[in-house]
């Protein structure tokens, strides 16, 4: 069983696209796309993780 993960090594980015590919974070918040999620991961100092793909 592999853990669900997203590579956030290219982040943070100053601006995200409006692409809608939702991800659910460990904070039980739905992020619109990988960019928004990864920016939040960076802001959380790595405490935020991916719960699953799709809405929470």
Swiss-Prot record:
Predominant location category: secreted
Site (Reactive bond 3) location in chain: 18-19
Glycoprotein found in the keyword field: yes
Xref: SUPFAM superfamilies: Kazal-type serine protease inhibitors
Signal peptide: none
Keyword Secreted: yes
Family annotation (PROSITE patterns): KAZAL_1 (PS00282), KAZAL_2 (PS51465)
InterPro entries: Bifunctional_prot_inhibitor (IPR051597), Kazal_dom (IPR002350), Kazal_dom_sf (IPR036058), Prot_inh_Kazal-m (IPR001239)
Record's keyword terms, sorted: Disulfide bond, Glycoprotein, Protease inhibitor, Repeat, Secreted, Serine protease inhibitor
Glycosylated residues (UniProt): 45
PANTHER family named in the record: OVOMUCOID-LIKE-RELATED, SERINE PEPTIDASE INHIBITOR, KAZAL TYPE 2, TANDEM DUPLICATE 1-RELATED
Protein name, as recorded: Ovomucoid
Species annotation: Callipepla californica
Upper taxonomic lineage: Eukaryota, Metazoa, Chordata, Craniata, Vertebrata
